Design a protein with these regions (language model features):
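Short, charge-rich amphipathic interface segments used for partner binding and complex assembly
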Residues: 6-58
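A ubiquitous short alpha-helical element
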Residues: 1-5
Length: 58
């Protein structure tokens, strides 16, 4: 099922929020999962991908 651009932006916003929560909780496993999802959603939207050097995602 394909998602609309608006739905993808909404998912990106929620994923960033989840990433920030995981970072505060110092949960590196969840941080990596959300960082990968953020980069995937950004690629889908055609915007610059965020870099996460502390997670080796550049």
């Amino acid at each position: 099922m394909a998602y609309t651009t608006g739905q993808t932006w909404g998912a990106l916003r929620k994923t960033w929020k989840a990433y920030r929560i995981a970072k505060v909780q110092n949960n590196s496993g969840d941080m990596r999962k959300y960082a990968e999802r953020i980069r995937s959603l950004q690629a889908e939207l055609g915007v610059a991908q965020a870099k996460f050097p502390d997670l080796n995602l550049v």
